[in-house]
Amino acid sequence: MTYPATWLLLGVLLLSWPGCGSQPELSPALQQEQYSKQRRELVAELRSDGISSQSVLDAMLKVPRHEFVPASYRHQAYQNRPLPIGHDQTISQPYIVAYMTEAAEIASGEKVLEIGTGSGYQAAVLAELAKEVYSIEIIPELADGARAVLNRLGYKNIEVRTGNGYLGWPEKAPFDAIVVTAAPDQVPQALVEQLAVRGKMIVPVGTGFQQMTIITKTESGVIERKTIPVAFVPMVGKPTP
């Protein structure tokens, strides 16, 4: 897929996007109908942009992104752009969420680790595909908020905890896939160790603008492949306890 040079595939921006003003009030039923229509339009856009996995597209169609953004930004929830969620963090651009999920090649029955829960949206998309999702968020307020939304929406296969993502979740390892939604300078070794053989880790690596990196674990080591340029917030925490 080819993009104009001016279009960066942004995962999580370092800045807040301004709102577009007040919107007319709709009845709850009409509002939900509008959200459903916008979700269908977004999924059609993702398909035309190169997302080909039907299971991923189905997950993106099912998960209500508007539930994971602040109320003042809900009218922008199905635009293909990141949005602020507070604490200098953002919810990722839907294309990036779909891209990372597709790259992870998650099958039903598998166990997934997410580093960087944020508002919980990526975890919800992963949970539509995986048997179990374990998600770590270093900012307590975001972890609490994500847990509340996910519980309200009925996601029983997601566990969120507050902690240092660099260390992973060793007591739940190994994981069939690991999705990292913040950028470390280098691939965290603890996460590689917690990846199952034949599992994949999707992680933006570097400072400033990063390269999305797909790591596949084999019996003899790891295979690392760099793909698209992205801009994620830096990963918070440290590689050692």
Task: Say what each PLM segment does.
Residues 1-6:
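Positively charged n-region of N-terminal signal peptides that target proteins for export
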Residues 7-16:
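Bacterial N-terminal signal peptides
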Residues 20-113, 124-125, 129, 142-144, ...:
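Class I SAM-dependent transferase core
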Residues 105-222:
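Conserved nucleotide-cofactor-binding alpha/beta core module
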